[in-house]
């Protein structure tokens, strides 16, 4: 069974939509969910969501990493080895191999910085890239990077192209994917 860590404190109206969506995923897709965040806020919503018997658990993470966290404060919350915010705890669970994926609706910059400090990076890759699939007339295309790195160097663009190509081949099954460049102006 696929195990997914969900940052229950990530969305604007946390934790209700995060918990309700996680319960729905467990019910409809048969995945195991590990919710990270303040258990005293998560558990009442979980109890009212008819989640009994579903593979949903809570891992208490009492600290918050918010949309307002920036600069040194954000880096400290992401980097500190004893950080107890829902993102740091979630990425640590993933790194230990206790889950297959981590999902957050939280601050994109915080998610990227926390992932870098908690998970590290692939050797030879200077910057991570966000890579959502975009629908097209003939299926989907993958766009790297969608804005987390507005000041890229040529070598970053090359690395994004390589990562996107490998992803398209190995995950999406696209033989000989095309790589192009779109400028944000």
Give residue ranges: language-model regions.
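A generic membrane alpha-helix/interface feature
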Residues: 25, 48, 124-125, 163
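Contiguous, glycine/small-aliphatic-enriched amphipathic segments in soluble metabolic enzymes
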Residues: 1-105, 110-117, 169-182
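Ligand-binding beta-strand-loop-alpha-helix segment within the catalytic cores
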Residues: 89, 139-183
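Short, charged/polar low-complexity linear motifs in solvent-exposed/disordered segments
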Residues: 33-34, 130, 160-161
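Short, acidic/small-residue loops that bind anionic groups at enzyme active sites
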Residues: 113-147
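Short, charged beta->alpha transition segments
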Residues: 89-93, 126-134, 166-170
């Amino acid at each position: 069974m696929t195990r997914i860590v969900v940052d229950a404190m990530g969305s604007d109206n946390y934790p209700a939509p995060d918990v309700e969506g996680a319960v729905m995923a467990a019910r409809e897709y048969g995945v195991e969910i590990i919710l990270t965040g303040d258990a005293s806020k998560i558990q009442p919503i979980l109890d009212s969501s008819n989640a009994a018997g579903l593979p949903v658990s809570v891992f208490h993470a009492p600290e918050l990493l918010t949309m307002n966290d920036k600069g040194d404060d954000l880096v400290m919350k992401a980097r500190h080895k004893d950080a107890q915010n829902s993102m740091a705890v979630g990425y640590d669970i993933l790194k230990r191999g206790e889950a297959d994926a981590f999902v957050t609706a939280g601050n994109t910059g915080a998610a990227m910085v926390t992932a870098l400090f908690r998970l590290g990076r692939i050797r030879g890759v200077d910057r991570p890239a966000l890579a959502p699939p975009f629908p097209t007339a003939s299926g989907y295309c993958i766009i790297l990077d969608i804005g987390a790195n507005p000041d890229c160097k040529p070598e970053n663009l090359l690395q994004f192209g390589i990562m996107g190509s490998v992803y398209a081949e190995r995950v999406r099954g696209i033989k000989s994917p095309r790589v192009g460049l779109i400028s944000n102006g």
